[in-house]
Structure formats: structure tokens, C-alpha cells
Amino acid sequence: MRYTYEITPRAIQKVRSFYRNVSKKYRHTYSYEDLYRNINKAVDDMYLIEQALVRRKPTIGRWRDYHMAHFGQWYYAYTIEGDTITIQDACHEQNMHN
């Protein structure tokens, strides 16, 4: 089955803000190329959710109404309605907490 994907602005913003903060903290060693490469990789990984990963129950309370997927260094909260996957939220593994 082929799914269509919708990514909420919240999920994209979480990825961008994480890497923006990394670039501010490590400004002498973290380049703009690294910033854009890491953001693009995290967003590209969102499109692999149902192709490579199994649906899991979330391990954090704020995602209790969603499925959870882990790919690379990111966890994604998503819902499936019909043939549409909606990615609701994203969280880097360093920030996983309730």
C-alpha cells in the first residue's frame, strides 16, 4: 500500500530548532552545510516511517494518542487515517522525556 504523507509545521519546527540550537552552541565546528544536511536527512527519514518501521506504542506520555517510530537519531509521533500518514511531532533522542 502506498501512503501519502502530511508533515505538520510542529514536526518540522522541532527538527529545525534542534539543529539551529546545535549550530549556535558549536558555531566554530558546525557549518551551515552540516545544518542543512542534518535537517534534510531528518525530514527525509520521515518519509520512511511505514516502509521500514513497525508501529510502536509511544514511550512518552505526551504522545499517547499516536504511533511512534524511531529512525536514526529522531523519534516521530504519527497517525494513520486511511492511506494518509500525518507526522504530528518529532523529538531528538537526546530530548526524549515526558
Give the label of every model feature segment.
Residues 1-65:
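Basic, Lys/Arg-enriched alpha-helical interface segments
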Residues 67-98:
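Enriched for short, Lys/Arg-rich terminal
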